Amino acid sequence: MRAFQVVEFASPIVPRDIPDPQPRASDVLVEVASCGLCHTDVHLQQGYISLGGDRKLPVSMTGLHTPATLGHEIFGHIMAFGPSSGLTAADVGRPVIVYPWIGCGHCAACLADRDNECPMPQSLGWQRPGGHGERVLVRDAKFLIDAEGLNSDAGIYACCGLTGYAALNKIVRRDGPIGIIGVGGVGLMALSIAKAMSLGPIVAMDIDAAKLMLARQSYGAELSFDTRSGNVGEQIQQATGGLIGVVDFVGAQQTVDLAVSVLRTGGTYVNVGLFGGALQTPLAILAQRQLVLRGSYVGTPAELRELVALARGGRLRAIPIQNEPMDSINEGLTRLRAGKVTGRIVHTHRQVTATQG
């Protein structure tokens, strides 16, 4: 099969011919039709995650080694399976969304179906080959979400959607305005989900005027603010009286400082972004304002199933999708790195034919 791989960090991804994976035991082989492009792929391709300042976490320390096949927003069809998978010939060809945040399978988190909390992750597109290959091996059928009736862009629910849904779920209170910092692909999806969950009013924050206009005019954000403004915190406080929750999809120093400054007493800050910010809040202030500070990393398999059910109910407004061939992945990464993508890029593989194994 053909796989687009990181052969050397910070260098272009290379198409390579590699052997087809073979399913054993409970494995399921999925033929990948499409795979969304995530900003995490940018970090992994460059070889490190910023920890703020000059500090960097090499991705090799997280279990990613070259050659690596990235891609975790996978939509495909069941192609083959191992003898203990619980599947039958009738399942071959069935469309699925792949839950990629697979854990070790043995720790307390995994046994409680909270694979995204596993300390020894085996995530597809990270520690294990992902959807930038034409076929992907999934350890267990329980990580496959039925996608009958959904289009091939639905793989974005596995990260772009799940990340927003799980982060919103972590906001403790629901009795006031909620802020979303960064209304790119994930933030725009979170806005769509927030509206489907009847949360709000929603305050959108970004540095891109076009994205803010889209959030307000097409996705229902009641208010929007350009975070480059010198007194944006004061503007938000004046307009809302403070926010009960902020989800930060950027995670830079400026965004965390802004988020904490506009929270009401008892408010919740949820960080998702990986842009290298550092949280510095006096403990006396933390106690006095009774703030809740949370990190959020994708979500659980159950949350993905809940999100897909929400999508099936027709309650989610689709975000803009740019469908492009997998051959253009390097160009897509360049645009994503430069912040020139509204919504999501979804790369499609060349036509392949599923067969039973």
Where are these regions (language model features)?
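C-terminal hydrophobic helical "lid"/dimerization subdomain
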Residues: 257, 301-357
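Mid-domain Rossmann-like dinucleotide-binding core that forms the NAD(H)/NADP(H) cofactor-binding site
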Residues: 92-95, 134, 148-229, 234
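Glycine-rich beta-strand-centered segment in the early N-terminal region that forms part
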Residues: 21-35, 50-106, 145-149
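Glycine-rich cofactor phosphate-binding loops and adjacent beta1-alpha1 units
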Residues: 170-175, 212-292, 353-357
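Glycine- and other small-residue-rich loops at beta-strand/loop junctions that grip anionic moieties
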Residues: 99, 157, 180-183, 204-205, ...
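Residues in the short beta-alpha loop(s) of Rossmann-like NAD(P)-binding domains
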Residues: 48, 208, 275, 299
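N-terminal glycine-rich cofactor-binding segment
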Residues: 5-22, 39-80, 115-127
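NAD(P)H dinucleotide-binding glycine-rich loop of Rossmann-like/cofactor-binding domains
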Residues: 58-72, 101-181
